[in-house]
């Protein structure tokens, strides 16, 4: 069996042409037949809350723009969505993060996972609700942010899948799984259920977060952009580069 490939690019800043070149190289790992066959792509950023890009809490819009342009050049219908946390409304989050401007510029279909319907799946007796949008697109691009996390130590690609869970349900899962181990087990179950729906994952680590992440830490310039079709390999590699050992990350 071939080992999964993790791509790493050293990128100093949010320069669109440079990131476009990296993204195009990353997507060479997607089978050309799949890109040709699928007409609709879902791009799922990290939209944790209403934070401006310089706060380094959410995926930088320039990284997302590079991905959007790649698929628009191939005449794909692009869906763009997430289920933000916190008390701010979806529109406020989308506007503050710089995502609304992208959606308007490129005429994207914006999906609020909290209101657009969900499916209830089951993993070994554990019911988990996820957005229906995940099952309505042939290509799904998962775009996380490179950060520390107070509960899970590290957040990258796998933790970003939690955004497929509708907003109020996310709050309920935090109540049901309040400690590190139970929450990590829930994340692993979520990955087991939907991981095969994710075509490719990218982690925006050009500027990430250190300290008390995922939202209260300090922006830190790492100058890295990661990509892989394998979420476990991607997170393992990115976490090790950040300085974590395997035992430090509970999932």
Model-derived regions, located:
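N-terminal and secondary-structure boundary signal
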Residues: 1-251
């Amino acid at each position: 069996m071939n080992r999964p490939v993790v791509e790493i690019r050293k990128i100093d800043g949010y320069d669109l042409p440079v990131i476009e070149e990296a993204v195009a190289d990353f997507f060479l790992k997607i089978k050309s037949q799949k890109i040709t066959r699928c007409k609709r792509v879902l791009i799922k950023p990290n939209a944790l809350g209403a934070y401006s890009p310089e706060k380094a809490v959410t995926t930088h819009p320039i990284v997302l723009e590079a991905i959007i342009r790649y698929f628009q050049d191939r005449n794909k219908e692009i869906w763009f969505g997430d289920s933000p946390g916190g008390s701010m409304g979806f529109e406020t989050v989308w506007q503050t993060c710089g995502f609304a401007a992208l959606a308007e510029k490129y005429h994207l279909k914006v999906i609020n996972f909290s209101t657009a319907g969900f499916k209830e799946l089951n993993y070994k007796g554990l019911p988990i609700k996820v957005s229906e949008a995940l099952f309505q697109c042939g290509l799904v691009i998962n775009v996380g942010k490179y950060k520390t996390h107070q509960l899970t130590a590290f957040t990258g690609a796998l933790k970003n899948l939690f955004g497929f869970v509708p907003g109020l349900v996310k709050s309920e899962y935090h109540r049901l799984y309040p400690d590190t181990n139970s929450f990590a087990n829930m994340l692993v179950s979520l990955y087991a259920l939907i991981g095969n729906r994710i075509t490719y994952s990218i982690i925006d680590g050009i500027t990430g977060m250190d300290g008390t992440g995922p939202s209260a830490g300090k922006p830190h310039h790492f100058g890295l952009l990661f990509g892989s079709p394998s979420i476990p390999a991607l997170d393992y590699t990115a976490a090790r580069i950040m300085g974590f050992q395997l035992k430090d990350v509970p999932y």
